[in-house]
Amino acid sequence: MGVKKKKEMQVAALTICHQDLETLKSFADVEGKNLASLLLHCVQLTDGVSQIHYIKQIVPLLEKADKNGMCDPTIQSCLDILAGIYLSLSLKNPLKKVLASSLNSLPDFFLPEAMHRFTSRLQEELNTTDLYSYRKVTDNISSCMENFNLGRASVNNLLKNVLHFLQKSLIEILEENRKCAGNHIIQTQLMNDLLVGIRVSMMLVQKVQDFQGNLWKTSDSPIWQNMCGLLSIFTKVLSDDDLLQTVQSTSGLAIILFIKTMFHPSEKIPHLISSVLLRSVDCTSVPEWFMSSCRSLCCGDISQSAVLFLCQGTLAMLDWQNGSMGRSGEALLLDTAHVLFTLSSQIKEPTLEMFLSRILASWTNSAIQVLESSSPSLTDSLNGNSSIVGRLLEYVYTHWEHPLDALRHQTKIMFKNLLQMHRLTVEGADFVPDPFFVELTESLLRLEWHIKGKYTCLGCLVECIGVEHILAIDKTIPSQILEVMGDQSLVPYASDLLETMFRNHKSHLKSQTAESSWIDQWHETWVSPLLFILCEGNLDQKSYVIDYYLPKLLSYSPESLQYMVKILQTSIDAKTGQEQSFPSLGSCNSRGALGALMACLRIARAHGHLQSATDTWENLVSDARIKQGLIHQHCQVRIDTLGLLCESNRSTEIVSMEEMQWIQFFITYNLNSQSPGVRQQICSLLKKLFCRIQESSQVLYKLEQSKSKREPENELTKQHPSVSLQQYKNFMSSICNSLFEALFPGSSYSTRFSALTILGSIAEVFHVPEGRIYTVYQLSHDIDVGRFQTLMECFTSTFEDVKILAFDLLMKLSKTAVHFQDSGKLQGLFQAALELSTSTKPYDCVTASYLLNFLIWQDALPSSLSAYLTQQVACDNGDRPAAVVERNTLMVIKCLMENLEEEVSQAENSLLQAAAAFPMYGRVHCITGALQKLSLNSLQLVSEWRPVVEKLLLMSYRLSTVVSPVIQSSSPEGLIPMDTDSESASRLQMILNEIQPRDTNDYFNQAKILKEHDSFDMKDLNASVVNIDTSTEIKGKEVKTCDVTAQMVLVCCWRSMKEVALLLGMLCQLLPMQPVPESSDGLLTVEQVKEIGDYFKQHLLQSRHRGAFELAYTGFVKLTEVLNRCPNVSLQKLPEQWLWSVLEEIKCSDPSSKLCATRRSAGIPFYIQALLASEPKKGRMDLLKITMKELISLAGPTDDIQSTVPQVHALNILRALFRDTRLGENIIPYVADGAKAAILGFTSPVWAVRNSSTLLFSALITRIFGVKRAKDEHSKTNRMTGREFFSRFPELYPFLLKQLETVANTVDSDMGEPNRHPSMFLLLLVLERLYASPMDGTSSALSMGPFVPFIMRCGHSPVYHSREMAARALVPFVMIDHIPNTIRTLLSTLPSCTDQCFRQNHIHGTLLQVFHLLQAYSDSKHGTNSDFQHELTDITVCTKAKLWLAKRQNPCLVTRAVYIDILFLLTCCLNRSAKDNQPVLESLGFWEEVRGIISGSELITGFPWAFKVPGLPQYLQSLTRLAIAAVWAAAAKSGERETNVPISFSQLLESAFPEVRSLTLEALLEKFLAAASGLGEKGVPPLLCNMGEKFLLLAMKENHPECFCKILKILHCMDPGEWLPQTEHCVHLTPKEFLIWTMDIASNERSEIQSVALRLASKVISHHMQTCVENRELIAAELKQWVQLVILSCEDHLPTESRLAVVEVLTSTTPLFLTNPHPILELQDTLALWKCVLTLLQSEEQAVRDAATETVTTAMSQENTCQSTEFAFCQVDASIALALALAVLCDLLQQWDQLAPGLPILLGWLLGESDDLVACVESMHQVEEDYLFEKAEVNFWAETLIFVKYLCKHLFCLLSKSGWRPPSPEMLCHLQRMVSEQCHLLSQFFRELPPAAEFVKTVEFTRLRIQEERTLACLRLLAFLEGKEGEDTLVLSVWDSYAESRQLTLPRTEAAC
């Protein structure tokens, strides 16, 4: 039951000429019942839909006539007119189809006459000679052939004429297209006409019966001659590369169709086409007509695109089914394949690549059709092992990762068809165990999961052979696929594959098993891994699985929901009961089973798998769980729970009372979400709920209105409709109350954004309709003056999103400003807006713009503005609102322009004064904002607008002239031109001359020497600095004294340029253009457009400041887009002219050029980007092609010094173009040339060229390999196979190979200075992103093998980083199975210890390669693999042969370190592979050798040299790692006893080198942490027991911060009971003194050490408290010191790490100090710790807030507090944790019986007693003056008044519940006095604020409002305690309307005192 209004069908009405109209009138009868009358009525209607009704009556009327009627002149004339009507209607008009359908039912006896009339009318059409009317005629021919009998018969009758017309029209269109070259709008239209003409020609051949015979196939037949003429035209079109490729491809189809139709005998057609494709036509054996029509195909050189389109025509137009073409057809099929394979290696243009992929997929379809016709001769040629299938597979593997989605889709079709082809060749045999399928499956599974093609191909395989064979190879595949679903780019592929697999598996299991037991196996395979991910996966994984996979699974198997719910409910119950029965389904750090349950239920309900909401709540999930989900700590759980409530598959499902209550509860705590994505989802889901309420209310309203008096027994509702409707109304009103309350003073951006978005949705969904639809709620009914003011105050937000939302909402409300504001208030708003528009704060002008627009649209402007109008608006009532807005906009713009004109005049005299007092950009911004909201295409006051536009343009140019010298100076960022009052104009002019651009690119020639006359006198400069005098008058306003900074000048100038650019761009985009000066409707003349273009050109090519030219670019883009759509040819060609002009300027630029070659060529790349990006993408992109050709040529290496500057420009422009996503795949053909230019440019001796080449190369890497998606720089997500890379860029294969060979051959040259080969870096950077794929096959054309020896030799580079890169680059080039042999080969090249001459660089490079290869090998293999162990053993033996490199015999520490790293890696690999089989290493004597290395190392003997030996830190770290491994190995062998080890942990810890100590401590810390967390198998290893004393000693003497920090961490992990008693003996400190020492460290050290020390001190404190109960008072002072330390560590300015440490401390000590039933601390200290918790819950850092919620969870889950709230043991969000913490605290105060001393402290929190209001206001003034971009206190999370609200609420509950009252009035006297003083101060400050203070003094106003609310809340509580107020007064919101709250605090009000 839907209530949505259907979209009305728009039908253009038919019309007839005057003569036909008179004819109808003459034949119409008086009664109006004959056909003429019917048609007359029809044509007189203006509504096309009504005309359809009349047309349908034509045939029934004619059926009533007898046969004599065919002689009736009335009917004859009407049939003639109907023919005319049909041919006059446009092709897409529904009337045309209706008329054709009606005439198809015409009685037979009328058909001859009707045919005659239609034929004569069509003949008239065919006789037309107007070129631009040809399209209409062509469309008519087409429509006649489509399901219209009369039309088809008419075309048959006129076939000769039709063909002649088509031939003539195509020839003339081609000629006209040639003449209109350059006018792409006309050319696009002509090419479209050409395309339609070709298609209609094909349609004729396919549908006209005459072509089925042979009568016309004679050379003298007119039809034959026309056919030959058309074929000749198609051939010409096919060869014309200036035409669109769609036109060419259609010509290819037409050529083959015509050949098929015309050629005789048909048996020879395949041979003829084959010879054309292979370019082997025997001209002597083909018919003369074919030669004359297709000579270029027979004798000429056919382009690649022409051959491609002919292949397409061959496959599409010939009949491949049933083997009708015989053997010659099969031969043609194979020849076509070979031609396509040849083309695939040649074609690189993206559009042609796309065509090729489609045609190859089409070829596989044709091959299947031929095989299905039982063609035995093709079986060998097309089976899986054939060369053709091999080539197709190569194509698939090469292109399955292609960036174009459509091309990847074609590879899927190809692969699917290949499998089908192979099945057809082995039909009859059991194809599943077929070697082809087995090998294909295994090779696909060997691939990594980051390859998209793997998913699609596996999906095809599953459909072909069944999933059971794949699961038999690896049953963990479902889990593996789910694991990768955290990567958004892979998610759609992974979910599609999973769906294919589980569907196939279910079908297979059902067919195999009769019983229902199969479902358990299916659940185990597909549902269990899903549940694990939902509970334990990372956030992205869960989100994507929920969005993509879960709906598919539940849609296919709804019965699985019960299984999932049962498992998850059991898991939640186990967790709540503290029984970890199901540890795999949820840990404390994950969303857990509750989140998984909500996700499943949400999806199930949204897709209709739950019967009703009632079933859900009653049977599947409890109320408590819903509430837990709504405030869960993890945002996705909250979203899923909300989704469960809001989403339903039935749009009219009633929203239950429970759902409404839960939604209200959710909104209370979730508006302040910090994630934009979460906010968007919340708002979207609530909008769905509102739509449900609106639509279900329609149903309820209809039920209520029904006349039946009995109670409705409808499944929709269980109560009377009126009750439900009232509930809806109350609910919506309550929601709006909550949302408006959320817009309180100081509310965060997130809260405001959410509240305003939801209110906007309410206004949209429950809009007041025109007419009769019932609306259950209207937002405007709940709007009063306070709320209207609240919305307006949202304009003051520093976030524009909030301004936009508030403005849009105000526009949606039916009540306007005039309803709520008096004229004085509106005048004040207007003045405030004008003041803000000239503020020096950039964000103020945005507020001004929204205020002005608000006043314009609300018609609330001051009456004084009407003086700006010279012409009043004349309008009827219908247009009145638009006319009023236009009038208001015009007045405001004129007012702003008048002000701006004065300010520009002032700025021309004193730019400094302008920057300090009236930066002009604000005015321009407001003008732009006002124009943007106005519909500029339908203006009424055109005569007034014209001079305004003209003046606006001149003003923009003037303003730009004033500020441009700063923007175009050499150093705009630091420039500050000074002027004096006396000589302002001349002084400024002199300075502006000085700051003209000086970076004239002469640094390309020589260093610039500062000449004597360039020097300046500092005294003279200082003398010229004069403060702006306060008495200076500007437009009658006083200007305050202000120090002008360089920043202020620059901001004024570049923002002015920005606003001018945006204004000009917008004017071009939105204003109607005047094609000729006399035009009455246009506002912008052609000359003005050209001026704007010249303006942009000048500033883009000359500006130096990025902000200026980037925004000039934005405006220029709008201009170029308009020009390219402009019908005026002179304007249309402007971008092309500008492009040629700037390219010539670049080519001719030299060091003296004005074009800026620094700053990445400044605005030049932007200029060219704008010109190219606006070129129509559907065209030939000629501008791009020519530009790229020029730039590539300029970017190449050059020896001419004069060409250096053009080269730099070209490189910078190329970088910008390759980064421009709008150019898409059109830029790809130039990537290879760009890469060559970048790599060669990197070898230039000129720094600027090298720098630009580097930037270009970086852009190319991103363009080729995609935006970096993984944190790991070397992750395969941003890599591609060598085959794919070199197939896409084949030119780079020989280039990179040659460059690499050149580098490798000279890298270790013996001649003099080592050659550092700068290009090696870029070469290796490319190569390391390639990898060999198992699917690459054995093709040697683009093999990666030749690169390997050169990369190995690059490892000999003298540059350390290059050697590392070579090692990384080598790894992907070596197949995994070849790695062991390669490692052995590399090891064999290392020198022996007896060799006399060797180079350490060579050794180092080789060892790095060994190390990286070994690492890759170990990562890719499973440890249990026997081959793996065998290979590692062989490698170990080879490694031992060169062991001298790890010993002192090798003098180089760098190579020693790498060799030791290899040894360490081998120990890790062999330990992993052997597990308990330790003798593998022992049998090789490996550990013995390692012990020898360590014993002989400097760790034992000491270091004979100074610390500054190269490679020392690296060597120490490597050696230490190996030593630690040896110690653990020895301990494992000897039963944890430290025997037979060359070195002990104690020795390592006593090393003089921090690198050694740090690594050792790291290893020990890891063991202690594992033991502390319970992850260790046996706790702390015995080797580490009793080391407390050692760590204490180390702590006292360690001076290295990192090591000291780790020692403290270890002590923290250890039980204090083990080491604390030893402090006095070891370090001569009592435990108490040790505690003081620890706290001193926590007070003074840097953050990380401070955090660890705080944790340690807290652990020591806890130990004292728990073990020394009787002597607690002995450390009372230390306890107080600790409390203060905790308090100080909570401050916002401290690092996050410090505050996280405090949270951890508070959480661990909660049972002891915060919730102890018998408090240990004094109440003041206990409450101070609680205040810390509350402060941390309001932190702006989410990590801190989330951690603090753990403290609250711990606090409310204690035995004495778990009844305080309903959320004990639950993970909650910080927003509700604040309220829960206060609830627990208030409960504890009552438990402790500490209300009397505790209440004043809590009331102090409420009032904010620490704030000094006077100082606060004074500091605000200081902030405003000093900081240009200071946005005051931008709070993203913390909201003071939310804390006040919760505290007030819980204090009231506490006081009400306990009934406590102060025993004496004096008890609260201090607070009452403070509150009274605060009231008076607030009143005073409010009086001092100016009018409209909320806009012009937002910061002060907001702070005062916040303090006012706090004071008000405190007043109410004090009144309640005194018995002056009842409960009903107190429960009012602490932020009632502004007016009410002001009354409570003003001095004249008694309540305020």
From Swiss-Prot:
Phosphoserine found at: S1015, S1024, S1161
Keywords from the named record: Chromosomal rearrangement, Coiled coil, Phosphoprotein, tRNA processing
Cysteine disulfide partners in this protein? none
SUPFAM superfamilies recorded for this chain? ARM repeat
Query: Which Gene Ontology BP annotations are present?
Result: adaptive thermogenesis; lipid homeostasis; negative regulation of endoplasmic reticulum calcium ion concentration; tRNA methylation; tRNA nucleoside ribose methylation
Q: Which parts of the chain are coiled coil?
A: 886-918
One cellular component term (GO) for this entry is:
cytoplasmic side of endoplasmic reticulum membrane
Key word Coiled coil present: yes
- Expression by tissue: Expressed in pancreas, adrenal medulla, thyroid, adrenal cortex, testis, thymus, small intestine and stomach.
The UniProt record lists the keyword Transmembrane helix: no
One Pfam family in the UniProt entry: DUF2428
| Gene Ontology MF annotations | enzyme regulator activity
Cite the PANTHER family for this sequence: THADA/DEATH RECEPTOR INTERACTING PROTEIN (PTHR14387), THYROID ADENOMA-ASSOCIATED PROTEIN (PTHR14387:SF7)
- Please describe what this protein does: Together with methyltransferase FTSJ1, methylates the 2'-O-ribose of nucleotides at position 32 of the anticodon loop of substrate tRNAs.
Give the disease association: Chromosomal aberrations involving THADA have been observed in benign thyroid adenomas. Translocation t(2;3)(p21;p25) and translocation t(2;7)(p21;p15); the sequences derived from chromosomes 3p25 and 7p15 do not appear to include a coding region and the fusion events probably result in truncated THADA proteins.
Q: Which family does it belong to?
A: Belongs to the THADA family.
Q: What is this protein called?
A: tRNA (32-2'-O)-methyltransferase regulator THADA
Can you name the source organism?
Homo sapiens (Human)
